[in-house]
Amino acid sequence: MEYNKNGQILREFYARHDLTDCFERDNAYLESAFDEINRIWFDNLCKIDEVNYLMIAEAPLWGKSKSYIYNPATPFTQFFQKSDLEYVLNTKIRDKAEFIDRCNQIGLLIIDISPFALNTEDTIINYRGKSKQNPYGITKREYRLLIQETLPTFFDCKIEK
């Protein structure tokens, strides 16, 4: 899976919002995050014998800590808590590595809907709503449009795998 088409969509998004001055810096981070996240995701996909359940997620915040559901070296995220899986499986789970293992064993695959690991630290735009305190947040409409534009170049490619 290549970043280039997604990067072009993002370049156009930044241009529409008069943020071209910030694009190169943000894009360098986003492309690097994209590559690492997808490497981890594909490595994990190979550990699932058969996909029985599909969970669609927004996108990881990633950042310096490399926070991601499939990264065993990072803490659990708000997105999917260990206690949720423990409840469903009626069992105790020791740590994140075991959590990922259990997801793989039951055939649970998590797919991000967006290729962009936007956050308030590494990118000028972010997934938080636009407000006076957060002028570079994107509105729900802008978010939907960005997702819609990247569906064929990102999400659909993962579904086909």
Regions found by a protein language model. Give the residues of each.
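A polyanion-binding, active-site-adjacent surface
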Residues: 2-161
